Amino acid sequence: TPKVPIEVLATADEEGAICQRGYFGGRYMTGNMTVDEYLSFRNIDGKNITDLQEECGLFKDVEFGCDNGWAKGYYSRFYEVHVEQGGVLEAAGKDIGIVKGVVGIGRLFIDFFGESDHAGPTVMSVRKDSMVAAADFIMKAWEVGQANSGKAVTTVGRIQNSPNIHNVIPGKTSIVLDFRSEEDALANEIKETMKQYAYSMKEKYGVGVEITQEIYTPVKLFA
């Protein structure tokens, strides 16, 4: 029998994969999210949290409210048990590790605009291919990540291409760059480097470029 009460909970969307903002559950618990902010969240398809909850059959009759969060001192300790994701412990032959903090996490949402034409008669010299520009950007992101290996990581894990037909030159390609680092300064350097590189696609490929959203959650080191 434990000497003190123990509560077990699961937090939601801590990396912002759905709502584009991180620490969704954690911010709820600590009162660092207002009701208005909660209701303003949209996923990449434009759906808000209440829409998604209803689709999943969750919290239909629950009134949302977290302006005050849990009272300070309500819990004396908080422990998060997390599965090993990167394979570092396994490679080192260790069973468990203790993290020293949370890395800074940033995202750039980028649209490349080209001109959709038929893939057959449109000669290469006049093409404005949004996918080619996006592919170039993705390779640059890979190179920047490799150059900062051990200190930062870069990933493009989402691509939306239009019209996405095999015999049509892409007219619009949207991607999301995810970048992370233990150093805020390095994360900012990567962000600025990739923004400049994105805009350089205009002259290189004759495409339009728009960065529609920038998100960054700073590094948090534990005491």
Task: State the predicted function of each range.
Residues 1-5:
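Flexible, small-residue-rich helix->loop connector segments that border functional cores
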Residues 7-9, 210:
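A structural signal for isolated positions on well-ordered beta-strands in alpha/beta enzyme cores
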Residues 13-184, 199:
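Midchain, well-structured core segments that form catalytic/ion-binding scaffolds
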Residues 38, 193-194, 215:
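Active/binding-pocket-proximal capping segment
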Residues 122-125, 189, 221-222:
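Short, solvent-exposed loop/turn segments at secondary-structure boundaries
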Residues 150-156, 205-212:
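Short beta-strand elements
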Residues 189-199:
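Short amphipathic alpha-helices in soluble, non-transmembrane regions
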Residues 210-223:
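An extended, acidic, His-containing surface patch that forms the Zn2+-binding/catalytic region
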